[in-house]
């Protein structure tokens, strides 16, 4: 099946649709640095969840099989924040939301179950609104260190650490040959 990758969930095979992601190049807005070189990637309908009894487990499995770990299940904070020392993958397991990326002047993107986003270090994000059942699975590459930046004084240090955060070896959804590899050069 050309153009499609199969990902195994803990109980059943689930298709990971090989679609080109939407790329967002986000600029430093004076509070949120964003990444100076690499775009935010948003994969619409990246993972098929239609028959999954535990859709979050499907994302956990896809991320882990592609070398991204430290998974968690939750929502997205309702305030602008970013991580300056690590990249982050977000998979929408249930529901839908409007998420603002890049800071207060950044785009508001609607995400729904099955969508995934990959945020390079420094990418601001916050939940604008969400359905009551909204559930996200987050994951991180093995390189980097988790931090949470929310204050103006975090920015100066972040400008240095963001640039030093290495490119991950794999795309969290599609592995070693995923779109992230070409987009983050």
Model-derived regions, located:
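Double-stranded beta-helix
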Residues: 68-69, 75, 94-96, 104-106, 128-185
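A short beta-loop-beta micro-motif enriched in histidine and acidic residues
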Residues: 75-89, 104-105, 111-113
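A structural preference for long, well-packed, hydrophobic secondary-structure segments
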Residues: 86, 99-109, 126-127, 142, ...
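Conserved metal-binding segment of the jelly-roll/cupin
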Residues: 111-131, 140
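Short, conserved beta-strand element in jelly-roll/cupin
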Residues: 83-100, 118
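A short, N-terminal "cap"/entry segment at the start of jelly-roll beta-barrel domains
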Residues: 1-81, 181-185
